[in-house]
Amino acid sequence: MWLFELLYFFYFFLRLRLEVPFYSQEEYRKLITLRARKLAKRYNMKIYVKGEPQPGFLAANHTSYLDPIVVEALKTGGAVSKVEVRDYFLFGPIASKVGMLWVKRENLKSRTGAIQQLNQWDAVKDPLWIFPEGTTSSFGELGPFKMGVFKAAENSGHMIQPLVFCYDNPQVDWGSTGTEKDLFKSILDFYKNKIHTNVYCFWMKPMKVGPGEAQKVADELHRRMLIYIRRFEKARDE
């Protein structure tokens, strides 16, 4: 049974991959949001949402391999991603169609160029998801924030629209070992172990970053997000 569900997962993305040429970018973004919601429903992943997003850089916490499905089910947007993903047969063309900011993480020149692009990014016209932690954190925790999105908001004048979301199943944790897990192994674990989870999502109040305030806003957002995570990200039986 789990093998059938795994095949459906790949069919899901293959279909999206084949549909890339037939939609405008805006139509494709709406399609992804619709499909992500259907995929979550199929796997009994109930998503509870409070609040509505406002225009700006979309900043969220990062815990699980399920995070991309959750955020795209709420609001489809691009993301900052390592350039290798662009060459993935299924995910690369889909991501490029949505609108990505590609970066070679081991290349200082590429990282600098990505920061410059981020500073000039129109976050209202082209929604962009950013995980300020830069990596996944353990279930119930929140890692330190990198300053990229906060500096970009300061330089561009765009608001930061934070989203904090909390799972109630520790098995979705992608950061407990402190090392990056293999994506495809995680997908196999999800189906083999029949992992189900609820997700509690909170659109927080947008934040303005004034001149010289990037660090201050980053610290304040981290403090606020951590309150939600420690309150709501708990195993279901706790």
What is each residue range found by the language model?
Residues 1-62, 70:
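Membrane-anchoring hydrophobic helices of lipid-metabolizing enzymes
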Residues 12-22, 53-108:
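Catalytic core of membrane glycerolipid acyltransferases/transacylases, capturing the structured
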Residues 96, 118-120, 175-179:
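Short low-complexity, flexible loop/linker segments enriched in glycine and/or proline
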Residues 101-122:
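A membrane-cytosol interface segment of integral membrane proteins
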Residues 121-150:
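Catalytic-site beta-strand/loop segments enriched in glycine and acidic/polar residues
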Residues 140-213:
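A cross-family acyltransferase "interaction/gating" segment
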Residues 196, 200-238:
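Long, non-transmembrane cytosolic or organellar matrix-exposed soluble domains/tails
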